Amino acid sequence: MKMRSFQTRAFDIKDQNKVMRVVVAALQDLGFIIERANGPMGLVTAGKFGPNGNGFVEVTVVVRAKGKEQTEVRVNALFNTKPVEDPKAYQNFFIAVERSLFVTQG
């Protein structure tokens, strides 16, 4: 449960498609290559090589409506098939998402 708390964030935006576009842009800004993006399912998968080319980082992001006024984003990250448990990795992702949302709203 603790890990889920830093993997999930709700945004006060009801436009799920907009949040999907922002998630894709944020991942690309962080150096990820988008492998799959399925808008109707709210699913994005991406990957990139780890620091100094060591290992591989895979992320799966799920975007879904939360009530009538919010959209929830949940990200799961794996490094060489092991779950990433460092909250900072998830914080960096959500900072990039928030930055992109701010730019698109401004």
Q: Where do the language-model regions lie?
A:
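Ser/Thr-rich, low-complexity intrinsically disordered terminal regions
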Residues: M1-G106
